[in-house]
């Protein structure tokens, strides 16, 4: 029996806004073909502190300050963001064309590596009772990862603005009491591995248009870690307009933090415990309007060849330049030097003798 025909008028396809510009790049069509897809597999290791050669993935035992003013943590106590920049195959031999190709991140498979190692309850841990096993890793945990075509942009927020962070870390400068809630001057790019303490920086929700990030924080003293492992979950990186992160300069940026909780030693001291994260990113080619005009490329080339001089300030608030004169062409010098120059209603420069 043939299926019955639908009654009523046929509905037109749903119209959605057409995206023109994403991350400062004018977006065009997707390039198809057998060579238009590539995949990147890698993993990022944790940066918990590593106080010695035997404690990779652990922080130093945490010590507590007596007052807010005296808080000065050791660098080995501070879990930091892990970050990597992955060079991708070059797509454009000629950057002077009107349209060029860019890699676009489409999907991601990711998971934490080594979750079963947290079942170890016999290595120097504090016993739960006289004849019991050691305490498992537990407490506050934070799991975060990002994929982008540019470095992750960060916003600084502090728990205690009077904390003195150690050398070798990058932290919000000139902190005030407003830094404990929101200070828009504390901005940064995640451009260095093992340098940005997790407790100081969060992804900036007002930016990161060309990056996808995901994170979960679970707080508490005795909260157990809850981690899943599977090779069937895929995260789609496309936005509501069907466009993913565009890899500028043929570079893919990845970052991660996986703090699983605290390990309690036999003595009662505690250390952060972190694990590695696996990434598998699928990318495709997308045609875009060339964001690098020839004038920009030539200027950049000339600037790179020009030696940089760290001299006295000649621009900005402390500029020592008093006056700059610009001349164009020649003109007659009148007997009476009184002249008035103005722009007429047609936009032409006029000189009137007074």
Swiss-Prot record:
Compartment annotation: Virion; Host nucleus
One Pfam family matching this protein: Polyoma_coat
Cross-referenced InterPro entries: Capsid_VP1_Polyomavir, dsDNA_vir_gr_I_capsid, Polyomavir_VP1_sf
Keywords carried by this UniProt record: Capsid protein, Clathrin-mediated endocytosis of virus by host, Disulfide bond, Host nucleus, Host-virus interaction, Late protein, Phosphoprotein, T=7 icosahedral capsid protein, Viral attachment to host cell, Viral penetration into host cytoplasm, Virion, Virus endocytosis by host, Virus entry into host cell
Gene Ontology biological-process annotations: clathrin-dependent endocytosis of virus by host cell; virion attachment to host cell
Principal cellular location given in the protein's record: virion
Outcome recorded upon mutating residue 269 to Y: In strain: Isolate TKY-2A
Molecular function terms from GO: structural molecule activity
Keyword Membrane: no
Source domain of life: Viruses
Outcome when changing residue 269 to F: In strain: Isolate MAD8-BR
GO terms for cellular component: host cell nucleus; T=7 icosahedral viral capsid
Transmembrane feature ranges: none
Result of changing residue 269 to T: In strain: Isolate YI
Protein function: Forms an icosahedral capsid with a T=7 symmetry and a 40 nm diameter. The capsid is composed of 72 pentamers linked to each other by disulfide bonds and associated with VP2 or VP3 proteins. Interacts with a N-linked glycoprotein containing terminal alpha(2-6)-linked sialic acids on the cell surface to provide virion attachment to target cell. The serotonergic receptor 5HT2AR also acts as a cellular receptor for JCV on human glial cells. Once attached, the virions enter predominantly by a ligand-inducible clathrin-dependent pathway and traffic to the ER.
Subunit structure: Homomultimer; disulfide-linked. The virus capsid is composed of 72 icosahedral units, each one composed of five disulfide-linked copies of VP1. Interacts with minor capsid proteins VP2 and VP3. Interacts with host 5HT2AR.
Entry note about domains: The intrinsically disordered C-terminal arm interacts with neighboring pentamers. The unstructured nature of this region allows to make different interactions depending on the structural context: pentamers present at the 12 icosahedral fivefold axes bind five pentamers, whereas pentamers present at the 60 icosahedral six-fold axes interact with six pentamers.
Name of this chain's protein: Major capsid protein VP1
Organism of provenance: JC polyomavirus (JCPyV)
């Amino acid at each position: 029996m043939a299926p019955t025909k639908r009654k009523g008028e046929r509905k037109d396809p749903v119209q959605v806004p057409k995206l023109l510009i994403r991350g400062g790049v004018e977006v065009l069509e997707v390039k198809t073909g057998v060579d238009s897809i590539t995949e990147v597999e890698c993993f990022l290791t944790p940066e918990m502190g590593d106080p010695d050669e035997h404690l990779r993935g652990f922080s130093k035992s945490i010590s507590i300050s007596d007052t807010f003013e005296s808080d000065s943590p050791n660098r080995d106590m501070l879990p930091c963001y892990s970050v990597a920049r992955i060079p991708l195959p070059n797509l454009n031999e000629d950057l002077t064309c009107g349209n060029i190709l860019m890699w676009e991140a489409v999907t991601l498979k990711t998971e934490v590596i080594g979750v079963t190692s947290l079942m170890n309850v016999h290595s120097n841990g504090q016993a739960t009772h006289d004849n019991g096993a050691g305490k498992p890793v537990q407490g506050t945990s934070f799991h975060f990862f990002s994929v982008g075509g540019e470095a992750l942009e960060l916003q600084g927020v502090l728990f205690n603005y009077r904390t003195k962070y150690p050398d070798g870390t990058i932290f919000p400068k000139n902190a005030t009491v407003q830094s404990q809630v929101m200070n828009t001057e504390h901005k940064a790019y995640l451009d260095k591995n093992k340098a940005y303490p997790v407790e100081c920086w969060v992804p900036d929700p007002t930016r990161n248009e060309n990056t996808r990030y995901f994170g979960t924080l679970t707080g508490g003293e005795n909260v157990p870690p809850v981690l899943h492992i599977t090779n069937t979950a895929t995260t789609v990186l496309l936005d509501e307009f069907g466009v993913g992160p565009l890899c500028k300069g043929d570079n893919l940026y990845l970052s991660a933090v996986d703090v699983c909780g605290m390990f309690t030693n036999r003595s009662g001291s505690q250390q952060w415990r972190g694990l590695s994260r696996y990434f598998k990113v699928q990318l495709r080619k997308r045609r875009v309007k060339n964001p690098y005009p020839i004038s920009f490329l030539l200027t950049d080339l000339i600037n790179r060849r020009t030696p940089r001089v760290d001299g006295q300030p000649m621009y900005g608030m402390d500029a020592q330049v008093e006056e700059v004169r610009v001349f164009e062409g020649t003109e007659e010098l009148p007997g009476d030097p009184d002249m008035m120059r103005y722009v007429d209603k047609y936009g032409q420069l006029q000189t009137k003798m007074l």
